[in-house]
């Protein structure tokens, strides 16, 4: 069957649209230093995510799911470049169709070598030569940009995880805001409170949140890069720091590091909101305090009890501090929960629901202190900071 030349030109026009769409996605994703909406990369992310949800849907063990989900980001990157190259292949094949003698299969056979192998094509005519040269150039540029993109991703990932690892050393893991305050005051049993280090901590995490907001909205696959340890997550780490700032501002308004804590909170909930919107979630810019939060007053009391175990100084009564804590947490809870659920972050205390509803929150791990007795045997003893809180 001979396809009319007019129909071939219509197909060529469709090919131009495919090439332009794919090129726009490549430029927006790999070159433009800001979050650029691309339906192609968004659909690839949704498709890969759906596959991983299907694979992990019946995996009950969180550690096993974490091992599977560790490959999620890499799969997104591979499928992303595959989608671009396939669209270029189909697009240039349709563009070539009016210039070749034969059917559409001949056009595909001519366009393929131009994209995959430099100089492997034999053009017939000036128009065909120009099309194949452009196809070859675009194929090389796309692969080169994707390769150059990887060091940028891993540099941002390493900066992010450096902050998470330092927080784990201070607060344990999975991270929890009250635990951060308790351990900071307890100071590893030194007898000298290190609460005076909180201003520096909040200043560091203000910068950390700003860096993550910029990098993770510009390079969205970073959101799905998981921490090296299964019980660590950048989402729960930031949530922990924000909860600790909200707690200390609510409980100790006169002695808290007000400016660093407020700036950290502002940078933190802006980070959560920006990343959540980049992922496609509809989160309010200014949440209504009357919405309430998922943390109950009883769980808030459990947190205060945890602080009292280590004699953390508290100025206000719980019933007076509670409204202020709610007012702070409502700013970031919805966005944080949306991201945590989407990436299946470790179910830390106060970090919201996950897809697997039967999964219980995991309290921070607190190893016992081992001391050698006179008989040479180790006798584990619990520190005040090593008691387990209520898993609210």
Give residue ranges: language-model regions.
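Short, strongly hydrophobic alpha-helical membrane anchors
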Residues: 1-9
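Cytosolic juxtamembrane amphipathic/interface segments immediately preceding
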Residues: 3, 58-76
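N-terminal signal-anchor transmembrane alpha helix
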Residues: 10-31, 92
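Pore domain of cation channels
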Residues: 18-22, 77-162, 243
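Membrane-interface amphipathic/juxtamembrane segments adjacent to transmembrane helices
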Residues: 30-59, 159-175
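Hydrophobic alpha-helical segments of integral membrane proteins
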Residues: 40-55, 107-115, 119, 130, ...
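Non-transmembrane accessory domains of multi-pass membrane transporters/channels
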Residues: 162-238, 243
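Soluble C-terminal extramembrane regulatory/interaction domains of multi-pass membrane proteins
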Residues: 171, 201, 223-226, 230-392
């Amino acid at each position: 069957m001979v396809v009319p030349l007019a129909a071939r030109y219509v197909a060529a026009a469709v090919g131009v649209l495919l090439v332009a769409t794919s090129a726009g996605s490549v430029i927006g994703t790999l070159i433009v230093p800001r979050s650029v909406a691309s339906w192609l990369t968004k659909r690839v992310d949704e498709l890969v995510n759906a596959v991983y949800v299907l694979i992990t849907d019946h995996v009950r063990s969180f550690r096993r799911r974490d091992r599977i989900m560790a490959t999620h980001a890499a799969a997104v990157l591979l499928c992303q470049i595959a989608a671009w190259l396939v669209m270029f292949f189909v697009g240039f094949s349709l563009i070539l169709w009016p210039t070749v003698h034969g059917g559409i299969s001949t056009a595909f056979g001519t366009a393929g070598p131009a994209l995959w192998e430099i100089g492997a094509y034999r053009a017939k005519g000036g128009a065909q030569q120009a099309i194949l040269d452009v196809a070859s150039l675009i194929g090389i540029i796309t692969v080169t940009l994707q390769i150059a993109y990887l060091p940028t991703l891993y540099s941002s990932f390493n900066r992010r995880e450096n902050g998470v690892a330092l927080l784990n050393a201070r607060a344990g893991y999975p991270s929890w805001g009250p635990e951060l305050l308790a351990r900071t005051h307890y100071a590893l049993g030194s007898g000298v409170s290190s609460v005076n280090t909180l201003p520096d901590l909040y200043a560091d995490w203000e910068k950390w949140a700003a860096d993550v907001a910029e990098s993770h909205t510009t390079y969205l696959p970073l959101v799905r890069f998981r921490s090296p340890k299964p019980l660590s997550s950048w989402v729960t780490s930031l949530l922990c720091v924000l909860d600790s700032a909200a707690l200390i501002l609510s409980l100790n308004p006169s002695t808290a590091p007000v400016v660093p804590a407020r700036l950290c909170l502002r940078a933190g909930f802006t980070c959560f909101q920006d990343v959540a919107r980049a992922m496609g979630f509809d989160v309010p810019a200014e949440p209504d305090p009357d919405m309430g939060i998922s943390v109950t007053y009883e769980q808030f009391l459990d947190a205060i009890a945890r602080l009292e175990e280590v004699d953390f100084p508290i100025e206000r009564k719980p019933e007076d501090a509670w409204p202020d804590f709610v007012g702070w947490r409502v700013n970031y809870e919805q966005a944080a929960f949306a991201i945590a659920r989407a990436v299946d972050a470790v179910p830390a205390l106060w970090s919201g629901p996950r897809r697997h509803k039967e999964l219980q929150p995991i309290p921070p791990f607190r190893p016992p202190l081992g001391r050698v007795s006179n008989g040479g045997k180790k006798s584990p003893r619990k520190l005040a900071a090593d008691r387990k809180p209520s898993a609210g």
